[in-house]
Amino acid sequence: MNSPRFDTVSFLTDYGTADEFVGVVKSVIRDLAPHVGVIDLTHEIAPFDVRAGSLALARCIGYVAGGVVLAVVDPGVGTSRRAIAIEVAGGAGVVMGPDNGLLAPAVAMAGGAERAFELTNPEYQLQAAGATFAGRDIFAPAAAHICNGVDLAELGPEVDPILLLPGTIPLPREDGDALVTEVLWVDRFGNCQLNVGPDDLLPTWGASLQLQIGRPSDPNGVTVRRAVRATSFAELSGGAVGLVLDSYGMLAISLDQRSAAEELGIGAGDQIVLVGLDDVQGVATAVTLSRR
């Protein structure tokens, strides 16, 4: 008889909550491991968007309780892609999901993979008529059994962590006196998180920056706006666009009590070029540059 190992599963998916998928997965876990509580991180990742799921999981990983982290954004469900469980943090946690890059950034932030196993043992799975609901049939039972104290080695063959698929988080790059960045995430308030932190900004830059939004090849060309570096939304009075240090230590394009994404036409994946400006007063009007 195994002794319980964990009492928490933190759960992230693209399932949404309109259908029964989330509830069924949680019910399977509760049935097999009644002592376990399931914490919903989010189930509103855009369908099939592995990158968005990996970024959300990376934002969460430093704050989740010790235990199992179950993430499912799985457009390749039912194919030869592997279902995996990865031990991290000296055994204090297990990160579980499809081997499609979803888990890689979070695993790296947790200190890297210590052991990894493919979930293939049918003794720890549910019998199913089809292969399209791995969350219910493979991941939920595995999460419950791990919480009950079953060693990962019982769930399937060990996998060399170096063979796991990497994530696809873009890096900023310098282009002369400019910094080419990308929008990683737009939150529900319309703040647009960039893939840069304050230390990535050029040391010669002051408090004012130029934002070049989009690419010349885009249908609407490039929109140019002035932004000011700020520590709170309240500093962005008079309609100023801000570059605010967000709660994850990244810089975000923001407005005060308005959606920067809507007003500036910005979405996840958009290119934003940052250019340093002389610190002058005033708020610039929008300028659009397009290819003739």
Identify the meaning behind each predicted range.
Residues 13-15, 41, 72-75, 88-89, ...:
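Fold-independent oxyanion-binding glycine-rich loops
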Residues 25-30, 87, 112, 198-202, ...:
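Short, solvent-exposed amphipathic alpha-helical segments in soluble enzyme
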Residues 8, 32-38, 52, 63-66, ...:
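Active-site histidine-anchored catalytic micro-motif
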Residues 195-249:
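A C-terminal functional module that forms or caps the active site or interfaces directly
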Residues 126-205:
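Anionic-ligand-binding alpha/beta catalytic cores of soluble enzymes and soluble regulatory domains
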Residues 228-292:
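ATP/nucleoside-binding phosphotransfer catalytic cores, i.e., glycine-rich phosphate-binding loops
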Residues 18, 22, 50-54, 131-139, ...:
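Generic structural signal for well-ordered, non-membrane alpha-helical segments
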Residues 2-13, 19-73:
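Alpha/propeptide regions of enzymes that mature by internal proteolysis
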